[in-house]
Each structure stands twice: as structure tokens, then as C-alpha cells.
Amino acid sequence: MKLVIKYGAIIAACIGIWVLADHYLLHISQSESRLSLLTPVFFNLAQFIVLFLGLREKRSENRGVLTIGKGIATGLAISLSYAIFAGMFFVAFYLAVGSKMLENESTGFGNSQRDSHVLVGAFAGLFFGALFGGLLYSIVISFALRVRPTD
């Protein structure tokens, strides 16, 4: 359980630092920026790398054995803790910054949607995106790191 919380918190910290740096220093996530694609690339790369490190540690904890099922389950648990920690960060960030945080969010119909609808969509996207990405990355990493137990 410590491993799951540790690596989930590491991913969330990476994402939080990126968001703070982008919001206050870099400003690359603005819609007119050509570099706005860096944010989703960074989010996915951070999740993949930290999941790899977490699953590698899980394998070493189990005396060098990692089955595909254990790897996927651990990866999903790490991704769930990441989604929860990142959600808590964004709630705190929204409470501190307010609706200025939503300036870069696409709302689909101009700015006609209420902030609450945009927030629910953003949190759902973060939560389910983290879980879906975690599932895909865990499958790939588990196949790469798998070591069958010897009888």
C-alpha cells in the first residue's frame, strides 16, 4: 500500500508542479500557444515513467517476480491514487485561484457553460484519463517486466 501511495503522489506532484509552472511562468497551455500540446504529452510521459518505476519496485519487493495480473493491479492502484491526489490538488488550486483557472479550458460553446459544468468535465477527464492511461501503461509495462515464478 505504501508503494501505491508513494508513486501516485509522485505522479500527482509532477502534474501539480507542471500546472503551477505553466499557470504562473510558462503560459504554454493557452489556446493560441503552439506548445499547448506539451501539457498532455508531459502528463502521459510522467505517468508512464513513474508507473514503470513503481512496477519495477514491486517486482524487486517480490524477490524478482512480477506476474502480469499483479503488475496490472498495482499499476491501476497507483493510477487511482494519482487521480485522487491530482483531484485534491486541482480542488485546492481552484479554491485558491478561482475561475481564472478555467480560462484555458475549452467549453465547447464559447463561454456559455457554467464553471461548475466545466469543472465536472475537467475532473472526470482527469480521473478517467488517469485510470484508462494507467490501465494501458500497466499492461505494456507488466508485459515488459513480467517474470514468472519458478516452482
Predicted regions and their residues:
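Hydrophobic alpha-helical transmembrane segments
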Residues: 113-136
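Transmembrane alpha-helical insertion/packing segments
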Residues: 1-58
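Alpha-helical transmembrane segments of integral membrane proteins
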Residues: 2, 6-10, 39-43, 69-78, ...
